[in-house]
Amino acid sequence: MADKPNMTEITSFDKTKLRKTETQEKNPLPTKETIEQERQGESTP
């Protein structure tokens, strides 16, 4: 069955080959201050 992982590969996996990476949000959520500034900008003509 291809759905089940090969247990020998899992038990013999070398974690030292993994590298640390710095993750960065591609589309971060706006802060409350940013939302308030945008709302104030929309209300003025």
From Swiss-Prot:
| One Gene Ontology MF term | actin monomer binding
Cellular localisation: Cytoplasm, Cytoskeleton
Q: What ranges does the record list as Basic and acidic residues composition bias? A: 12-25, 33-45
Gene3D superfamilies of this UniProt entry?
A: Single helix bin
Query: Segment Disordered: which positions?
Result: 1-45
Please cite one Gene Ontology biological process associated with this protein.
Answer: actin filament organization
Which InterPro entries did the record assign?
Answer: Beta-thymosin, Beta-thymosin_sf
SMART domains attached to this UniProt entry: THY (SM00152)
Q: Which residues form the signal peptide?
A: none
Q: Which UniProt keywords apply?
A: Actin-binding, Cytoplasm, Cytoskeleton
Look up the domain of life of the source. Eukaryota
The record's section on PROSITE patterns has:
THYMOSIN_B4
Q: Pfam families attached here?
A: Thymosin
Q: Name one GO cellular component term.
A: cytoplasm
As for what it does, the entry says:
Plays an important role in the organization of the cytoskeleton. Binds to and sequesters actin monomers (G actin) and therefore inhibits actin polymerization.
Q: Which family does it belong to?
A: Belongs to the thymosin beta family.
Q: Which PANTHER family match?
A: THYMOSIN BETA, THYMOSIN BETA-4-LIKE
**Protein name from the UniProt record:** Thymosin beta
Q: Give the species this sequence originates from.
A: Danio rerio (Zebrafish)
Gene encoding the protein? tmsb
